[in-house]
């Protein structure tokens, strides 16, 4: 990836993080309406309880590993390796969204489509912004924050199962 130290201003990073949250949540809500006819639709199985020790490990591993692996692959290799602008944006964005379609792994076509459509607007936006600016840091910060939020939700539902039951 083409990171240059000092290139990222704090206000740009903040703007990217906020826009990632808005585009990400908007994509999930819209996909929920398209696939399930419910607005807003939130898939409760995404933060279902797991053994507490795994939830604690997940809290530390998920944000770091997925942020570096996914952004390095789809932005660093995907976007940077393709010469045509729109193909460089759309192909990595497509596979970025496909990857998230199977988390959690449910062999249900509607759920897979919901997950794909949830992430597609965000992954297109991320790939477009990176293609235009070649600065991965704000995207990685936003991605890390989204992953921390997911890990915190999983930790809470795992530590206090009653919280998850209230969501159903």
PLM features: what roles do these ranges have?
Residues 52-168:
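Transmembrane helix-loop-helix hairpins at the membrane interface
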Residues 1-66, 158-168:
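Juxtamembrane helix-loop-helix connectors linking adjacent transmembrane helices
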